[in-house]
Amino acid sequence: MGFFITFEGIEGCGKTTQLRLLKERLEAAGEKVTVTREPGGCPVADQMRAILLDAKNSAITPLAELLLYAAARAQHVQEVIVPALERGETVLCDRFTDATVAYQGHGRGLDLTVIEELNTLATGRVQPALTVLIDCPVEVGLSRALARIEATSGAKEERFERESLLFHQKVRNGYLTLAAAFPERFVVVDGSGDVRQTGLLVAEALRQRMQSLGKAGLAAVKAGC
């Protein structure tokens, strides 16, 4: 079996950039890597992503939102993640089940027990071995995210970025609560600095965690920046 790593964080935290940098280091070292994301990651789930992230769809209810995420995840796990792990690849996923707990649970206030049950059903109990939480103040993350959106041509995925500061603070608190509850799986990295600063912190955090997991080869790959 392969090794499953997820990257999590609030809007604009820099997780997508750090995931890409890790992919490049792994591939340069000869590792086989599958990079994917949620919502989306495959054609069926990408159609649901378009609905979920389009600001024009502000009428989506919290429950409908939750169920769309679960449906997209069920397809994504079976079509992309499980096959890649069975091929022995390292899977890097931009958001996974923790995002649903943070956004729909802590942010929207939906029942956490229901979310846990849906996540278990959608994933077939597939869970990451390691989750990298890129944490930064809400104001910093939103400033970056909105600047990125304004610079983007074509369809803008901005429904969550347009939520209130209070919503995003609840999401951040939800992530930090998860990290405290599952310290054996989470590493928390300060993402308030620039890309290089954050990258160095990610590399060192991964090196230490991989060594503790007995993944010496992967630890050596991830230490470079």
From Swiss-Prot:
Keywords per UniProt: ATP-binding, Kinase, Nucleotide biosynthesis, Nucleotide-binding, Transferase
Cross-referenced Pfam families: Thymidylate_kin
EC annotation from Swiss-Prot or TrEMBL: 2.7.4.9
Record-linked Gene3D superfamilies: P-loop containing nucleotide triphosphate hydrolases (3.40.50.300)
InterPro entries for the chain: P-loop_NTPase (IPR027417), Thymidylate_kin-like_dom (IPR039430), Thymidylate_kinase (IPR018094)
Biological process terms in GO annotation: dTDP biosynthetic process; dTTP biosynthetic process; dUDP biosynthetic process
MF terms in GO: ATP binding; dTMP kinase activity
One GO CC annotation: cytosol
Catalyzed reaction equations: dTMP + ATP = dTDP + ADP
Binding positions for ATP per the UniProt entry: 9-16
Function, as annotated: Phosphorylation of dTMP to form dTDP in both de novo and salvage pathways of dTTP synthesis.
NCBIfam families: DTMP_kinase (TIGR00041)
Family recorded in the similarity comment: Belongs to the thymidylate kinase family.
Protein name: Thymidylate kinase
Name of the encoding gene: tmk
